[in-house]
Amino acid sequence: FRVDGFVFGILNKENEIDFERNQELIALAKPFPCSFHRAFDRTSDLENSLETVIKLGFKTILTSGANNVNDGKQTLKTLVKKAKNRITIMPGGGLRSTNIQEIDSFTNATYFHSSAIINDSGIANLDEINLLKSLIK
């Protein structure tokens, strides 16, 4: 297998970042970069969680900032600003061709995540992928 990195994120029973368990996985993943997935959005204080994830050594956080990127765009903007290039904030969760330009310009994020699934098909749509690519050039 060829691996470029790992995506995971462990929360404790209180839905806070489990420092020790994440630290163990990051150590096991070395030398590969790690991204914290959308479990981040379940924490009660995203700004504090941001600092914890940075301290752990994650390189990216996949987050919607709320239930989806539309609802969380102000939070995403705040997270990008507070990250100060110490970690990449990657908006994802409801990101489609219909909103990527707005989320891009509003948040100033540099990386984005989309499943490119439309019409509840459960499968990424090639036309949606190509449209997303054309909109973020």
Q: What is the predicted function of each stretch?
A:
Residues F1, E14-R38, Q74-S97, E128-K137:
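Alpha-helix-loop-beta-strand connector modules within alpha/beta enzyme cores
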